[in-house]
Amino acid sequence: ESALKSGVHLLYYSFPKSAKETSDGFEVEITGKSIEKKVFARRVIDCTGNAAFVAMAGYRRIKGSEIQPGTLDFKFSNYNPEKIDKAALSAAYAEALKSGELHPHELWKNINGLIAGGGKGAQHLVGADSSDAFVQTDSNIRGREAFLRLFRFLKRQKGLERIKISYV
């Protein structure tokens, strides 16, 4: 509200394709949902999440020593939580963590919370990076590998043999 009242022009669902600094601002080529347009801006607030505009404008990006992990949301279905032995599932999960098959950051809830909560969960992908398409692709592949490890682990557990992926 404040931004709009102050004369800021917002454009959601778009991202910079190129940026060139001029003597009185920035010439920006943007692309997004059904648009491709060149605009001029006196000032730009880079909200890309990966400082894409900063890099395109020719400035150096500074990456902190710690970056926010990526998040992969998912949901499992086709099981009855009432028929799951929680103690056995917890023990199997603890063993999978101990053996290195699974990693603690790969499941936002505890294993029984995931099952009791209707199968909705999330994984934190430590080291996920979106600074360019190549490293973001690598991050996405690693995230899906972690998700599949969890899915395959669950399918081996009594009462979860027919579990299905509703969405990722």
Where are these regions (language model features)?
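A conserved beta-strand/loop element that lines the FAD pocket in flavoprotein oxidoreductases
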Residues: 4-17
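Hydrophobic aliphatic residue packing
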Residues: 7-8, 28, 45
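Flavin (FAD/FMN)-binding glycine-rich loop and adjacent Rossmann-like elements that form
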Residues: 12-13, 36-43, 47-168
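Short secondary-structure capping/turn micro-motifs that flank functional sites
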Residues: 19-20, 70
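Conserved beta-strand-loop-beta-strand element in the redox core of flavoprotein oxidoreductases
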Residues: 20-38
